[in-house]
Amino acid sequence: MEERLRALCDLAVSGVRENAGLHEYDGRIQDLSPAGVRAGLARLDGSARRPGPPGPGRSAHDEAHLAAFEALARVELGELEEHRWNPLLHLDAMDLSCYDREYAPATERAEARAAHLAAWPDAVDAARESLDRVPRPVAAALLPAVRGLAAGLDPADPVAAVALGAHGRLVGHVERAAVSGDPDAALGGRALQRLLGVGQAMPVDLGRLEERADAERDRLRAMLDDACARLAPGHPTAEVVAGLLRDHPEAGAVVEEARMVTAEAIAFTAERGLVPGLDGECVVGPAPPSRRWALAMMSWAAPYEPDAPSRYYITPPEPDWPAAEQEDWLAVFSRSTLPAITVHEVAPGHFAHGRCLRRAEGDVRRTLHSVAFVEGWAHYAEEVCVEEGFRDGEPRFAAGVALEALTRVTRLAVSLGLHGGSMPPAEAVRRFEAEAFVYGPAAAAEAARAAYDPTYGRYTWGKLEIMRLRDRARAAWGGGYSQQRFHAELLALGAPPLGLMGGILSGSPGTG
């Protein structure tokens, strides 16, 4: 691998290992100590300053793509020093779940997992040294994840026993921050603007983005109202939504229903040609224990791995949960929302996108994936299915898409408000309840996520930028426009920074 790209990957080990399939990093934990981060940034700066031509065969577009990711690393770890206030970086580095998927023989993965686990004590020492300014809301929101990191480890195993001791020290460190940390987790408008814009290679006007979020919320609410009026004329939307969420498969049938919707979504995507060259196998099944924190997720066969089935994981409720908790969990898999979730996770969403990434040209496109593009594409895919008449345009599906989208647009509004200082935490919870039909503990958890995931509005932002580019493509290409052409040219870029997508119109980067 070329030196600049290697220096960048060394600063994003867990991400490139799992999402790009760079398994030379197996068994290793990124050094997130203060000295380790400084050394990594120094290598990054040294490789970027070294004179020489672009990497072999690298286009100007890919050069800009690489430069945006380099700039983002400097902002996250240099300017904002996220390793000092966000335990999530350290949790991601220590996470063992990356070895569960069958990308290599079981013995090889077991050896890598054991080496990774043996490195936990050093990783915890680095985390405790770095995490010296964790805000109280960040620590409180992440404590369950910190405690759950060691789930399933066997204390009778000598390596695991040492790792568990280290894990206890990390839990104690974060517990103390949850009591004594700064009560204010806001980054400030300038920091949020840098965090959003630099990695996407585009200027960001937070005020304008907030206006766009409000307009999108209003559009989505109208979409939901229309769907509910078609389903139950004369009944209030909230009443219809409550009924839709109560209509779900039983816990033991959720995975099978997801399997059927997956086949339907793949067939529809292929029939309409919504994603070029859709191939590969998508296996649907219950999430392994290490992934049960997610209700539904895609784990794709990554670009640098041998081809293998991608995994669409579904997490039904635990059978020993109280009945009310099981019902709340199953509402996510209602017959309105499960199809929306599935087209997002599978096709034309993440699974289909992952297949395109395996065919992307060049190391930059195969390795560096803009999360705002990845999630924006999958969220956009939901609305494309509504436009294209998935399930013959049934209003139940449109209602499910609108409900999912209202949660995501509320995340964008809340992240802008909380980190910009204009929205108190109680107002953030109220927004989810009033505007997204998310209530009680679920609304509180959604609002709390903004503290440690300040860019979690990326789903809506990415979707809006793709839709805006689509309008421009229609105008620029005229009679040569088709949905198939737009998707093919866009996905050929891999998962680019949002600000570079416009290169498909002009043939040059940075015009988005």
Give the positions of each predicted feature.
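N-terminal maturation segment of proteins
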Residues: 1-512
